[in-house]
Structure formats: structure tokens, C-alpha cells
Regions:
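Acidic, Ser/Thr/Pro
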Residues: 1-242
């Protein structure tokens, strides 16, 4: 078991084209494992006590001087607080710049979706998946933000064009998030918007939830960047009296 995990309390598996949401408490971990290879997990984060506070991709990248997400990086809100830290990572690169797939992306690449014909194997897109989950909390399209795409790597050509790296995630690769404040998590397993596979992906992702070990003073994420130390200070101030 990981040094960051105290106990595993819940496990589930999601196939491609699925979506899910839940409130995750501070001190909880979420480990996501790509069971089949080349998974994509789109994620958004909100403060359940103030839904106006949400994940901010530009600030997350800017304050940590990076274009990618990996071990040591923290996922910031637009209030300068840390939703979660990436405490373990098998891949070394996760995307948070390319955005989300939409119905037109899916149709152009793999044809129209048809629930009547395909049933639960229909070709769902990330945008509509997020809208379904947002609606459960009184939110809508206006509340969407730039999302994380776990397990996906972006390559940039000399001309500045973005492309999805092929065969980036292998079966069994995982990433471990430790939540530093109560967080409303929205996620989907729909294809990355730059996915050019011949067929709609049919992979599977395992998600484990449980109690994380307490944060030590020499915590890797806390000390990864000076900015992260200040982010943890913002969280400490926010949690006074709780």
C-alpha cells in the first residue's frame, strides 16, 4: 500500500463514456488506475460550501511554473486554495490545457451517438457528461471551467499545433490525489478532445477512495514549490475553527 494511504474504504470501476460526481472530504485520497491503457479522466473541482469557488487551470499552471501536471503539483482554486495534491503519479504528465470533448468532436471522429441503438455503450462526450453532473447541484453550463484530463499527454509541434500523445498511459498506471479541503468532484471517462483513435475508446478506470495519511512538514507537494507552501497556508487559514 502507498505511504500516503491509511485505509481504502471504497472501490468502483467506470467504463469509457461514464460520468460521476461526489463530495470528497478533506483528508481523503482518490487513486485512479487505468486498467486497459490510454484512458482519459476529465475532472472539475468546486468548493461544496461555496460553489462559486472552483478549479482554476491557468493559476494552477502559472503559479507552479509548469505546462503539465505530475507528482508534486497541486490543483488550485480561483481563491488561491488547494483542492488536491498529486502525491503519486506513474505517468509524469497530465493535461489541463486541451479542454473537453463535445458532441461535434465525437460525431466527427466516430459518428453520431444513438442511445436507442447503442444503449449504455453509446458514444458520450465530456461536455454533456459534465452538464449532467453539474445539474445535480443546481449548476449549469455557465459554471464550467477548464478541466483536468488525467492520463493524457499533449505534444506541441514546432508550428504550435497540439496533439494527443499516443500510448501514453499503460494498463495499471495510476495517479493518487490527496484532498486538502472538502471538494465537490465531477469526473467523466469520455475521450480526450484530441483523440484520433479509429474507434471510440472502450477502456476502464478503477477509482479507490479512503483515508489519507496526515501531512508531514516535509511533505513533497507542500515543499515542491514555494507557491505551494503559501497555498497550504491559505488552506490552514480557511480551516481555522473547523
Amino acid at each position: 500500500m502507498s505511504d500516503y494511504i491509511k485505509s481504502i474504504e471504497y472501490t468502483t470501476k467506470l467504463t469509457s463514456g461514464s460520468h460521476w460526481s461526489l463530495r470528497v472530504r478533506r483528508g481523503t485520497f482518490m487513486r485512479l488506475t487505468d486498467l486497459t491503457g490510454d484512458a482519459n479522466v476529465g475532472m472539475l473541482f468546486y468548493n461544496p460550501e461555496d460553489l462559486l469557488e472552483r478549479y482554476n487551470a491557468p493559476d494552477t499552471l502559472k503559479c507552479q511554473h509548469t505546462f503539465k501536471l505530475t507528482k508534486g503539483n497541486c490543483l488550485y482554486s480561483d481563491m488561491g486554495r488547494i483542492f488536491a495534491s498529486i502525491v503519486e503519479d506513474d505517468l509524469g504528465w497530465h493535461d489541463t490545457v486541451a479542454g473537453n470533448s463535445r458532441a461535434e468532436h465525437i460525431e466527427a471522429q466516430w459518428g453520431k451517438r444513438d442511445y436507442q441503438a447503442d444503449r449504455n455503450a453509446w458514444k458520450q462526450n465530456g461536455h454533456d457528461s459534465f452538464l449532467v453532473e453539474l445539474g445535480k447541484y443546481g449548476l449549469n453550463a455557465a459554471d464550467l471551467a477548464a478541466n483536468v484530463n488525467l492520463f493524457s499527454k499533449i505534444e506541441i509541434s514546432n508550428e504550435g499545433d497540439m496533439a494527443l500523445a499516443e500510448n501514453h498511459s499503460k494498463p495499471g498506471n495510476s495517479v493518487l490525489l490527496r484532498f486538502e479541503m472538502d471538494t465537490l468532484v465531477l469526473l467523466h471517462t469520455c475521450p480526450h478532445p484530441l483523440d484520433k483513435s479509429a474507434h471510440y475508446p472502450r477502456g476502464k478506470v478503477k477509482i479507490e477512495l479512503g483515508v489519507a495519511q496526515p501531512i508531514a512538514e516535509d511533505d513533497y507537494c507542500k515543499n515542491f514549490r514555494p507557491e505551494n507552501g503559501r497555498g497550504f497556508e491559505n488552506n490552514a487559514l480557511y480551516h481555522i475553527g473547523l
